[in-house]
Amino acid sequence: MILVKDAIITGKKQDLLVEGNIIKKIGNISISEVSKDETEIIDGKNCVLIPGLINTHTHVPMSLFRGVADDIPLMEWLSGHIWPMESKLNEKIVYAGTLLGTIEMIKSGTTAFNDMYFFLDSIIKAVDETGIRSTIAYGMIDLFDEEKREKELKTAKESLEMIKNLNNSRITGALGPHAPYTCSKEILESTNALAREYNVPIHIHMNETLDEINQVVEKTGMRPFEYLNSFGFFDNVNTICAHCVHLSASEIQIMKEKNIFAAHNPVSNLKLASGVSPVLKLLENNIPVTLGTDGCGSNNNMNLFEEIKAAALIHKGVNLNPVAVIAKDAFDFGTKNGAKALNINSGEIKEGKLADFVLINMKKPYLTPKENIESHLVYSFNGVVDKVVIDGKLVLNDGKMVNIDEEKVYEIAEEAYFELAN
């Protein structure tokens, strides 16, 4: 058990008791109520306790791609830099990148993430060791080639079976077709069938740039959401669509009708000059918005607090509307909405929810005065957290990983980058 004493929880000083991996009680809890031998007591004085953040779109092993290709357009970035480097990936490199990336997320308050990448056994190994929660998909790209399609579907299915057989509630599977401009109709149709068979979500890039939309229109005569909807891709499945930058009215209507989650990646979209997602229109149509960092190659970090702030600010400026996205909504994008998208019983601090939470020391200049906590967390906090509990276990204590040798991780990450870049 874990007992957090005297933290600011939902606006007032309270205690919180964790039993197993569940928040058992919130309120005034005496130490005499618990067994001292079986309970870890955490002093929450001067701290605010918040739900762990949820990153709904990333490529965690790409922590090693940080800074390798800045200030260029997406298609040049992909074909000229990222894809050539990815051709050199191996299990060792992906393991090192995932260790580095998951530590970065935990140290900035993220407790769960939604990933699409390769070498899933290496990702799973690192996730298991760091203690973070994850939804993982093998990234399928068939480039309209039948032989490659069969291989990709086989690997995706094997990955789902592997994750299923882990019997680890922290690690769940998903299906990750890359995008409509890199995947054939056949692989996309098979994705829907597999998602229903395994009862897992679909994670896909959608409408990130005008160029990719034009590619789909030229091939099919329809915009990407219209094209996928024409053969039932969104039917009877939970779909998380990353980016959603350039959307027509009909596409927004499809998202609304099919209960699609938008994974908004404001920093990555700005850095690659892809554009700005019409989040205000999504909200007006009751389309749930979540937040992602994308990979470090296009961000260049995985600090979701930066995405929360960006989401709160950008849409004010774009819409000339100071209440386009208010602080509470932006924070919900990164917590409550993400939990719904990934079907995780978290995202809020309530009794009966999973014990995935973060403690932040408020004795900092950028978090003072303490009366305005909600505003500070969105507009002034830098993301450096003190303690993180995931699945009822303390994984970060006083800013340091509990069960991971951080120096060793930095060492193997540097070695992996050297192998990748040379």
Curated annotation (Swiss-Prot):
SUPFAM superfamilies: Composite domain of metallo-dependent hydrolases (SSF51338), Metallo-dependent hydrolases (SSF51556). The keyword Hydrolase applies. The keyword Hydrolase applies. Substrate binds at residues 86, 178, 208, 294. CDD domains: ATZ_TRZ_like. InterPro entries: Amidohydro-rel, Deaminase_MtaD/DadD, Metal-dep_hydrolase_composite, Metal_Hydrolase, MTA/SAH_deaminase. This is 5'-deoxyadenosine deaminase. It comes from Methanococcus maripaludis (strain DSM 14266 / JCM 13030 / NBRC 101832 / S2 / LL). The gene is dadD.
